């Protein structure tokens, strides 16, 4: 057993008390990202090592692996704790998103170690989609690079508001305060182009030597701020969904017997309470919450992130993919939306194509009407393109086969985030973040002349690959 865990169990007074304390600690999900060889995996290995989260057999295995694959001479190569794939160890790079868990007395953490290479942008976007904070690692010798800008942009695009800029390898620049300040100013100048209200913090460190990671550095007396671990332990995460209106996407209708009908799902925003009047969308039918059921017993209320089963006072028609909101709130159904897309397939995204999409438990179909632009994620410029290639990020217009109740992604990632699914292979080919739900911009049929209506039907019959919309309101 890990000696630190054994000590904590003894301190808490037994296994049950320890597990109870662990369960009620706050959880922080964060990712590490940066350019190739900036030391992301080494930093995570250092965090695990210095917080004593490594078991004895892991430490023994690490000694052996360091001799075979290590890059640090006689020292332990802490990066090997995270780089688990054989290809990663042989190449000395991170390819897949590697997840690790550790905890301190103050908090629990889930780390996503994401790839630094541009060709693995989709992997990084996947890792960032569930995180609250991003650690942007920089090599003190190189400063702000294109990949640093790219990772900053992707992180903020996916809703991350807290950025910790970790200036690594300070030991290679003689722990120079001047170098650190120059990099700090360069990044703040660039960060002015990023969207939203960002919380940006800076920590100079050496992941290899352990300076300012979990222990205050004796080599940088000029830095009086917190260590990286202290930042992670004490930072207050602003979760927008806690302050948002109620959003409860129904994932499953639970009917084990004739006497029970519940709607299972995870609260995606706001708070639901017993007795609260709710409205089911898209039907608009109202009822009130009779019970909030969980495995551990009934609750009086449930907040964002809690998985519960709601029992309503009335038996109304609700199915998987429907959305429960507060009865006093309105959420308009829209047929189209402007969506930021991260494309993940070898086959590029082309206007006119249709895909299955999944959003908050609901599955439907969408057509790509237009690609406004692709973002050059190395310098944040926009360029007009005919298609969106693998790892491309751009703004597109989508038209849905049926009206959907959507939020902006920055307001609610669950009801504003979607995935694209290839209709033939059933493979996920892209991720989308709703920037702006759009009301139906099409004219009523009566606004078109008889000639326009006839021409529209002719085009749809003989040129279906053009993807022309039915002006009479069909699909």
Curated annotation (Swiss-Prot):
Listed transmembrane segments: none
Residue ranges of the region described as G5: 206-208
CDD domains associated with the record: CysN_ATPS, CysN_NodQ_II, CysN_NoDQ_III
Biological process annotations from GO: hydrogen sulfide biosynthetic process; sulfate assimilation
Chain positions covered by the region annotation G3: 113-116
Key word Lyase present: no
Chain spans, region G2: 92-96
Pathway the protein contributes to: Sulfur metabolism; hydrogen sulfide biosynthesis; sulfite from sulfate: step 1/3
Gene3D superfamilies per the UniProt record, alphabetical: P-loop containing nucleotide triphosphate hydrolases (3.40.50.300), Translation factors (2.40.30.10)
Role played: With CysD forms the ATP sulfurylase (ATPS) that catalyzes the adenylation of sulfate producing adenosine 5'-phosphosulfate (APS) and diphosphate, the first enzymatic step in sulfur assimilation pathway. APS synthesis involves the formation of a high-energy phosphoric-sulfuric acid anhydride bond driven by GTP hydrolysis by CysN coupled to ATP hydrolysis by CysD.
Entry similarity comment: Belongs to the TRAFAC class translation factor GTPase superfamily. Classic translation factor GTPase family. CysN/NodQ subfamily.
Name the record gives this protein: Sulfate adenylyltransferase subunit 1
Organism: Cronobacter sakazakii (strain ATCC BAA-894) (Enterobacter sakazakii)
Gene this chain is encoded by: cysN
